[in-house]
A protein has these predicted regions:
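Conserved aromatic-histidine-acidic binding/catalytic patches
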Residues: 1, 21, 120, 124, ...
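Primarily EF-hand calcium-binding motifs
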Residues: 5-21, 50-72, 96-110, 131-150, ...
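Short helix-capping and inter-helix turn/linker motifs at the boundaries of alpha-helical repeat units
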Residues: 1-4, 54-55, 92-93, 125-127
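Amphipathic regulatory helices of Ca2+-sensor modules
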Residues: 25-46, 74-89, 112-126, 148-162
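A short, hydrophobic/aromatic-rich structural module that often spans a beta strand
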Residues: 79-101, 135
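Acidic/histidine-enriched, glycine/proline-rich intrinsically disordered or flexible terminal extensions
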Residues: 158-179
Length: 179
């Protein structure tokens, strides 16, 4: 894995490790999902919120199933790096995760995500506002103030699975996250 994709992997791990204990665990995924749901003021019991929770849970199960040889219920950075080096093994998991996030943020179900919801979600994850704004601008080339759901889903999938450095989500590494 080259430097830029490895930086993305490390950043993802840091953001997923919501309690900063050096491991990613099931509770981290629950905390992250709840933070995102609350950030966009969605009722936790709504279908969209439940889909986000399930997307995070499925991501966790896919991760631990792939790396669960030691059955300790947690994933260290070196294990995470091993897992993500094979993105094809979890493409469906990431797609579901990405779609659930995008549909949550499409609050009026018009196929687009407005900047305020995008920023709220990405801040809840832990990204720096300047990086989020740079990514949003990349995904909104006409300055309409909104991003197509399908464009953001593709960007999330690239962030998790691509080895390329010319992807829009690479902008998220421009400024350190705010943890």
């Amino acid at each position: 894995m080259t430097t830029a994709p490895l930086e993305r992997v490390r950043l993802r791990f840091t953001l997923l490790d919501t309690d900063a204990n050096g491991y990613v665990e099931a509770d981290d995924f629950e905390r992250l999902a709840i933070r995102i749901i609350k950030a966009v003021a969605e009722p936790v019991s709504s279908p969209k919120a439940l889909a986000v929770l399930e997307g995070h849970r499925r991501y966790w199960r896919g991760l631990v199933d792939d790396l669960g040889a030691d059955h300790d219920g947690r994933v260290a950075l070196h294990e995470y790096v091993t897992h993500v080096a094979r993105p094809e093994r979890f493409d469906d998991v990431i797609r579901e995760y990405a779609e659930s996030l995008a549909l949550l943020l499409d609050v009026d179900d018009d196929g687009f995500i407005e900047h305020a919801h995008f920023l709220a979600c990405m801040r809840a994850v832990g990204f720096h506002p300047a990086s989020v704004d740079a990514l949003f601008a990349e995904l909104d080339p006409y300055g309409a103030g909104k991003v197509a759901v399908r464009a953001w889903v593709a960007s999330i999938k690239d962030f998790y699975g691509s080895q390329r450095t010319d992807i829009p989500a690479q902008r998220l590494l421009a400024v350190p996250s705010v943890g």
